[in-house]
Every structure is written in C-alpha cells, then in structure tokens.
Amino acid sequence: PRYFSSAASDVYKRQIETVPSEFTLHARKEKHNVNMGGDNVAFAMMASAPNCSDIDNGRRAGNQKDFQNFLRLAQTHNILHMTGGYPVEPVDIHASVRHLDCIHDYITFTDKAYCIYSLGEERVADAIEMTRIAHGLSRDQMRDQACMFSIINTNSPLQLDIPMMQGVMALSEMGQPVVITPFTLAGAMAPVTIAGAVTLQNAEALAGIAFTQMVRPGAPVMYGGFTSNVDMKTGSPAFGTPEYMQAQHVGGQLARRYLSLIHI
C-alpha cells in the first residue's frame, strides 16, 4: 500500500488473476519435461559463477570448455531437472556473441530445458529462434509451448531497466516463462530492515508479474526474489546470511499468498 495507490493495486490484482497456476516447461525429450507450479519442486544448476575449480587444475576463470563440462554433468545427474543459467561464465567468448555459443552448447550437450539471459531485444530474439528451431516448432506452436525461461532482475529500487523490459515483452509474447526476481540488498538499494527490504521485493515482483499479463494474458510467470544484506563496513553483498534465509522464508509465503508459482 505504501508504494501503490488503491487504483493501481486494483489493476495489479486484476492482472495477476490471469497468471496460470501451473505450466509445463518442455524439454527436447519428453521425459525431461518439468511441471512447474502446484506442489512441484524443480532443481537446477546455479548460474553465472565467474570462476570454477577442480582437483587437477585448481581455481580459474570460467571458459567454454568448463561450461560444456558442467552441461555434461547436468545432463547426467537426474536430480537436476533442468540446466538453469550459465553454470560458469565462459569469459573466453566475447560478450557480444557469448549467448549464441552458450545456447548452441545447451542444445548440443543436453536435452533438458534451460535458462536464457535477458540482455536486450536482439539477444532474446536470437535465443527464441535458436530454441524454436531446436524444438522443431513454428512460432505459433512455440507460443503455446514453454521451452525455456529467463530470470528478470529489477533495478531496485522500483524500476526495471530497458533490456530487462524488452526481454519480458519478447518472452511473454511468445509464451515463454519469466521469473521476476527483485535483487534487493538491505542497506544498499533497499531498506536496511528485512521487513522493509521484503516489502520492496514484493512490490517490485508483483509489478513485474502484472506487466507480463499486460503483454499477454495467461503468459507463464513466476515470483522470484533475492533479498539479502550487505556488509555494512564494505558495502559488499553478503550471501548465505541469516537475514538472507529470513527473506527467503517470507518471500516464499508471499509468493504462495499471491501466486502458486514460486522461484527463489
């Protein structure tokens, strides 16, 4: 209520009513399809680690070979229902074309569903087209079959930047799910208290979710959240803290309050 007028709140409520309670994320092999929503729980790899390590070669910056090896592991382990985002960032590929190589590797090394990065209209269009071809679908068929997803981070406080909004519009129009995930760090871009930071997270998530339904009513979307705190001496993000876990518990309850789809 602090962030939205009652009229705006009514708009958001009407839009959120069209969010599907469940959907299927289709892999290229039917046995790897993932049911999202309801009482289903799905596990994926973590995303965007800058470095990786192993016993033989130690710690190093991410590269395409390591990226491919992580995809092989994701394909092998049945506890991973989908690959998620880039398990390690392949910094040896230029950023301007990295998405093309990474999606090609997704398609080559695994038949599970994957996450694409919403970094502007052109890159999202590339991802949609490559995924459509890999699944053997027409554009009309793809609009009714979720094949990939994307994490959409807000630019807290209370805004979404242009590349993310372009991704939301392109993916929602094509019926591909997005996870609206506010990145709200208490003491930095969000109030310093957990209650205040989670309130901001909730406002931003609901606004993003409502926007997907303005683009296309019934588009699959999930409530995400990354609320943590910062080191008050250095300003650096702090991960795995008690405050982070408190925010996750509260965020999950809020997501179930508003929607039956949740991603944390």
Task: State where each predicted segment sits.
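Short, conserved glycine- and acidic-residue-centered signature motifs
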Residues: F4, N63, T199
